[in-house]
Each structure stands twice: as C-alpha cells, then as structure tokens.
C-alpha cells in the first residue's frame, strides 16, 4: 500500500513465530488459474523456487533456509529474523508446469488471447477479486522499438503507451494526450557513501 506494507492478495493470512524466523502462509479460497484449475500451495512453492534461482528475484531469498508445503499452506523458514519478509513476496505466481510456456498460466484479471483479430487481453470471468475492470478487451500491438511505439501512439493507432522518465520514447505530450501516473513494483534507492571523499567532509 502507500506505506509499503504488504497486502494479502493470493493468501488470506499469514503467521510467524516469535522471532520471525518461520512464516506460514495460508492461501485464499476460490482462486483459480486462467485454465480454471485451482491455485495450490504446490504451485506457489514451484514459482518461488524458480524465482529463487532467477537473476531478478534471487536476492530476495538470500535469507531463506527452506520452503515447503503442509496441509495446503506454504511454510518458509529463514536463517535470520526478518519481520519484513512478507514484503519480498510480491512475485507473480504461475501454474506449476506452465512456467516455460510463452504465456504461463496466471490468476490475474485478464487472459492473454490470440484470435482472428490478433492478440489481446480479455477479462477473466473467474478472477477472484470483486474490483470492476475498466475494459472487457484490450488490443495488443507488437512493435520492434521505441521509435515505432512513439509513432503509433502519435498517429493514434495505439491509444495507451507505458513509458518511464528514463525511456527513449521522447516527449509525447500534446493537447490530446493525458498523462497518468500508476503504481509499479519498482523502487529506486539513491545512496551516498559519506565515509569516503568527497562526501566525507
């Protein structure tokens, strides 16, 4: 949330021991993947183990001693106490066995669909949330580079373009363009070493 406190999404609740070295996560009921199969603790465990070996997420598991499932729950044991460990688990969960697919099976609000009209995101009728989705269908366009994306946006062939302040998409602002900030899972830290020159003075 706005205070960077973790919010339960796929788990209904979690518990930890007194010294915060062991966590038990209980999954939310009624959550299914895009193929209709139910989310299980085994799916979560498989995803986290794959994340543990990945370049992107491996650092988050540096303090993890072991992970296992028990009676439909996920148990994570740590090497050292960490009261903020749940905040590290904002990792997309996919169905075990589908992680190597071009489009792995997830539990999100939209389904990736390819039909006669091309690729699109279509509302997931079995999504577990009661949030009203803004669109039933979102058409997708594949582009080879940021210049092409900028051109398609400027010519109104594309109506939504995601860009960050460091991107090379250029200044796309105009009287007919609306800029909207949106939350991401990215956090940027700026650190200063005050123990060495020139900042040690």
Positions of PLM-derived features:
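N-terminal lobe/hinge region of extracytoplasmic solute-binding protein
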Residues: 1-18, 26, 49, 61, ...
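Extracellular/periplasmic solute-recognition and catalytic clefts
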Residues: 113-120, 139-198
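Short, hydrophobic/aromatic-enriched beta-strand segments in well-ordered soluble domains
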Residues: 25-29, 72-82, 121-125
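Aromatic- and charge-enriched surface segment that lines or borders ligand/interaction sites
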Residues: 12-56, 198-201
């Amino acid at each position: 949330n706005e205070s960077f406190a973790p919010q339960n999404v796929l788990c209904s609740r979690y518990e930890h021991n007194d010294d915060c070295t062991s966590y038990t996560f209980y999954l939310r009921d009624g959550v299914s993947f895009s193929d209709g199969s139910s989310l299980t603790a085994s799916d979560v465990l498989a995803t986290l183990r794959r994340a543990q070996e990945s370049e992107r997420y491996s650092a988050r598991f540096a303090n993890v001693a072991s992970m296992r499932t028990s009676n439909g729950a996920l148990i994570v044991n740590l090497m050292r106490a960490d009261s903020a460990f749940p905040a590290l688990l904002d990792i997309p969960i996919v169905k075990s066995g589908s992680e190597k697919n071009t489009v792995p099976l997830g539990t999100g609000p939209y389904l990736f669909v390819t039909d006669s009209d091309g690729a699109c995101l279509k509302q997931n009728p079995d999504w577990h949330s009661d949030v009203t989705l803004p669109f039933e269908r979102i058409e997708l366009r594949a582009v080879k580079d940021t210049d092409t994306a900028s051109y398609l946006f400027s010519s109104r062939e594309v109506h939504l373009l995601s860009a960050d302040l460091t991107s090379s998409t250029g200044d796309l602002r105009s009287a007919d363009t609306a800029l909207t900030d949106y939350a991401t899972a990215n956090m940027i830290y700026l650190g200063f070493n005050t123990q060495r020159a020139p900042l040690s003075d």
